[in-house]
């Protein structure tokens, strides 16, 4: 069997600093995502004083705030948490699409990993399921993805 070098991220958050962007819109969902992300990072060695939660109005504001945080040089990773729930107008498509594209651009342009924890659901029930019930907690998943990516990038 051939031996191939494999680079993997360790799930050790000790010594790392994270910014968590959390929207106020749909905060009854987002607060569960934030709780999951904070708990995950703490369980993996991140000190609570090394986490900063930044509350913003909604998902559309995520990219500009993520950009400012990334440019600050103070954070190893950024976790973007929010919930956009489809309504009767096309507003959902514009907000969800632009927030998603913006966050991806920030990560690529800055080199700072941005965890995508923006729920885009068709109903409140689906959002609740993804905020800690049947479908897990997407805040935890976004935090885990950022932590692993930070540790992988340290090795590249």
Swiss-Prot record:
Could you say which EC number(s) this protein's record lists?
A: 2.5.1.78
Which Pfam families does this chain map to?
A: DMRL_synthase
Residues of the active site are 91
Name the chemical reaction catalysed here.
(2S)-2-hydroxy-3-oxobutyl phosphate + 5-amino-6-(D-ribitylamino)uracil = 6,7-dimethyl-8-(1-D-ribityl)lumazine + phosphate + 2 H2O + H(+)
Q: Please give the biological process terms from Gene Ontology that the record holds.
A: riboflavin biosynthetic process
Superkingdom: Bacteria
Molecular function terms, GO-annotated: 6,7-dimethyl-8-ribityllumazine synthase activity
Which pathway does it operate in? Answer: Cofactor biosynthesis; riboflavin biosynthesis; riboflavin from 2-hydroxy-3-oxobutyl phosphate and 5-amino-6-(D-ribitylamino)uracil: step 1/2
Against PANTHER family, the record matches this protein to:
6,7-DIMETHYL-8-RIBITYLLUMAZINE SYNTHASE, 6,7-DIMETHYL-8-RIBITYLLUMAZINE SYNTHASE DMRL SYNTHASE LUMAZINE SYNTHASE
The record's similarity note reads: Belongs to the DMRL synthase family.
Q: What is this protein called?
A: 6,7-dimethyl-8-ribityllumazine synthase
Organism, scientific name: Nitratidesulfovibrio vulgaris (strain DSM 19637 / Miyazaki F)
Gene assigned in the entry: ribH
